[in-house]
């Protein structure tokens, strides 16, 4: 995991340490066994030790993740050498945003984008900690860069860290949010790239948004 985190940082992508899944053991209190919460399912316990964690293995370790996240390869290497089991968190809204849709909708949208000549950037498949369906993550050019501070705008699609748990439809990860990066594991298997990052500039989010929104709408029919 360390070498991959270093590669992300070397590409200029902000990274920070993420929680990981670990084997759950029985937990007891003086009143007997603790109630089993969502984060206590066998094989899906979060390393944060938060009872009923809504996103086991899929959030930063530190509450100060927005301050600590960075793209220094040396620092990233040191972090993961010290905590080799940590998942990789990519912070959005600085270098890139992420359009996050159900995997089936993402596949349908991809099939339509190519004939239409719409260029996509990196696309990842991310299993969800507490949901049966995977999510497709489309990496796009950010609209929340600091250079655009005076013109930054929000919309109802914006996704924030509190928006944990299974959510249908389209989510837009921008400033103040994050995603779990391949090959981190936060569900039944590890996240993976469908289309790996390359040298080409990231696409404009609005070019992809129509296709993704239509695919999500059709999936609800």
For each feature predicted by the language model, list its residue ranges:
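Catalytic core of tubulin tyrosine ligase-like
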Residues: 138
């Amino acid at each position: 995991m360390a070498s991959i985190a270093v590669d992300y940082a070397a590409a200029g992508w902000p990274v920070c340490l993420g929680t990981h899944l670990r084997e759950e053991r029985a937990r007891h209190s003086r009143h007997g066994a603790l109630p089993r919460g969502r984060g206590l399912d066998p094989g899906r316990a979060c390393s944060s030790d938060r009872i009923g964690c809504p996103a086991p293995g899929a959030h930063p370790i530190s509450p100060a993740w927005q301050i600590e996240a960075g793209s220094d390869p040396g620092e990233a290497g040191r972090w993961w050498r010290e905590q080799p089991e940590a998942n990789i968190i990519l912070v959005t809204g600085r270098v890139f945003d992420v359009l996050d849709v159900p995997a089936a909708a993402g596949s349908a949208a991809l099939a339509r984008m190519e004939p239409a000549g719409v260029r996509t950037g990196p696309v990842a498949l991310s299993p969800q900690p507490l949901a049966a369906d995977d999510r497709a993550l489309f990496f796009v050019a950010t609209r929340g860069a600091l250079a655009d501070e005076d013109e930054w705008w929000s919309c109802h699609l914006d996704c924030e860290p509190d928006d944990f748990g299974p959510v249908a439809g389209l989510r837009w990860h921008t400033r103040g949010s994050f995603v779990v990066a391949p090959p981190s594991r936060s569900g039944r298997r590890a996240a993976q790239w469908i289309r790996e990052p390359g040298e080409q500039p990231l696409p404009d989010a609005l070019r992809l948004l129509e296709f993704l929104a239509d695919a999500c709408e059709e999936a609800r029919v």
